[in-house]
Amino acid sequence: MAGGTALTPTSVGSKSVPMRNHEATERGNTNNNLRALPKAVQPVSSIEGEMAKRPRGRPAGSKNKPKPPIIVTHDSPNSLRANAVEISSGCDICETLSDFARRKQRGLCILSANGCVTNVTLRQPASSGAIVTLHGRYEILSLLGSILPPPAPLGITGLTIYLAGPQGQVVGGGVVGGLIASGPVVLMAASFMNAVFDRLPMDDDEAASMQNQQYYQNGRSRPLDDIHGLPQNLLTNGNSASDIYSWGPAQRVMSKP
């Protein structure tokens, strides 16, 4: 119809129904908007289910990066080593330990011993200090002491032993002579490379400190190895030998602060 609104026929069933152009345009826009809507968000419960199904840990076959090996080429000078020493029958225990300390250049601290000895020469701990020689076979109850490689100050090394006799008597004292093993003797000892010699007691009052400081300023301190002739490896204790001094006419040995 001229001058009227254009109509577009549509089919409803078997009949054609005219539809206006603007109505068709609006319906087309509506369909486009529906297609542009985002998809429905997945429920949180389903997401948690998927996360729970994921395997934990590293993927199969994954490994750490290899670390470079740590190689210790020598012992620390201040290390303390445990030694189990077996001494054969017929050997002098004191001479064997002294030879071991000299060859290894390590000091020994004897902690315990098991076995039997014979022909023991002891200095009794009584005030008389009598020296006795025990003949026969005695079982070791206790063996304590220290052995240092030469040169070492007199009186700083030695062994003290307590023995059980065949009749059950107990004797003991400082070993001053032979100590012959009667069968295998096993000792537990701690060995060390460094030792520091100190003379005690040290004066801590203010007057002694001022006096020591005065001697230090006057350059009258002397290294310990010049006084006692100790080997260098038994003096350092990780520091230089100059860190150890003797102070004053009383020959006190103190460490530099």
From Swiss-Prot:
Pfam families: PCC
Function: Transcription factor that specifically binds AT-rich DNA sequences related to the nuclear matrix attachment regions (MARs). Encodes a nuclear matrix protein that acts in the maintenance of genomic integrity by silencing TEs and repeat-containing genes through epigenetic machinery. Acts as a chromatin remodeling factor that modifies the architecture of FLC and FWA chromatin by modulating both H3 acetylation and methylation leading to the regulation of FLC and FWA expression. Negatively regulates floral repressors including MAF4 and MAF5.
PPC domain boundaries: 77-214
Quaternary context: Interacts with FVE/MSI4 and MSI5 which are components of HDAC corepressor complexes.
Main localisation: nucleus
Region (Disordered), start-end ranges: 1-71
Record's protein name: AT-hook motif nuclear-localized protein 16
Localization (cell): Nucleus
DNA-binding region ranges: 53-65
